[in-house]
Amino acid sequence: MKNNQRPVIRSTTVIGVIRDGKAALGSDGQMTLGNTVIKHSTRKIRRLYHGKLVAGFAGATADAVTLLDRFEEKLEAYNGKLDRAAVELARDWRTDKYLRRLEAMLAIVSHDKALIISGTGDVIEPEDGIVAIGSGSMYALAAARSLMKHSSLPAKEIVLESLKIAADICIYTNDHIIVEEV
């Protein structure tokens, strides 16, 4: 690491799935600083808007919590309308000098919608109802798509199994898994 660089904090696999009118979102608990694991049980997901949504984050923790707080404010302002709150947060993220510097991504699920709000302020709604962010996201996404196609597992089990698979592959993902369902 060069003197003028901050240590890179890598952590997290967050995945959410919608199936049969139920949604689940989960994450691992590992946080690393550079090449060292500094915490095994970080909580990276939380329920929002009276328990009707679950959101998870990847990236710098303080930045992500700031964004989650802003997102909750938008949800309250727009009566829980997920799309509208996400677009308004993304708009603020792109235009506000302070927010533009935040390094985080959000994944959000409700019983019928899954969204990613990217670090560039984009709002992405995947066609298959699966959202994945973080260092192990592509492993978890591949596992979830396969399980959706070839099993009848409920959303919560798909999330759990996908995170276990990602933990077996990604060195920045562990098996201290938390899953919430709506």
UniProtKB/Swiss-Prot annotation:
The principal localisation class reads cytoplasm
What keywords would UniProt list here?
Answer: Allosteric enzyme, Cytoplasm, Hydrolase, Metal-binding, Protease, Sodium, Threonine protease
Pfam families for this protein: Proteasome
Catalytic reactions on record: ATP-dependent cleavage of peptide bonds with broad specificity
Per UniProt, subcellular location reads as: Cytoplasm
Q: What is its EC number?
A: 3.4.25.2
Q: Which GO terms describe its molecular function?
A: metal ion binding; threonine-type endopeptidase activity
- Disulphide bridges: none
Q: Which GO terms describe its cellular component?
A: HslUV protease complex; proteasome core complex
Q: How is its activity regulated?
A: Allosterically activated by HslU binding.
Q: Which residues bind Na(+)?
A: A167, C170, T173
Q: If you read the UniProt record, what top EC class would you report for this enzyme, in one word?
A: hydrolase
One BP annotation, GO: proteolysis involved in protein catabolic process
Q: Which residues catalyse the reaction?
A: T12
CDD domains xrefs: protease_HslV
Family designation:
Belongs to the peptidase T1B family. HslV subfamily.
Q: What does this protein do?
A: Protease subunit of a proteasome-like degradation complex believed to be a general protein degrading machinery.
NCBIfam families for the chain: ATP_dep_HslV, PRK05456.1
Please give the subunit comment from the record.
A double ring-shaped homohexamer of HslV is capped on each side by a ring-shaped HslU homohexamer. The assembly of the HslU/HslV complex is dependent on binding of ATP.
Q: Which HAMAP family match?
A: HslV
Q: What is this protein called?
A: ATP-dependent protease subunit HslV
Q: Which organism is it from?
A: Pelodictyon phaeoclathratiforme (strain DSM 5477 / BU-1)
Q: Tell me what gene encodes this.
A: hslV
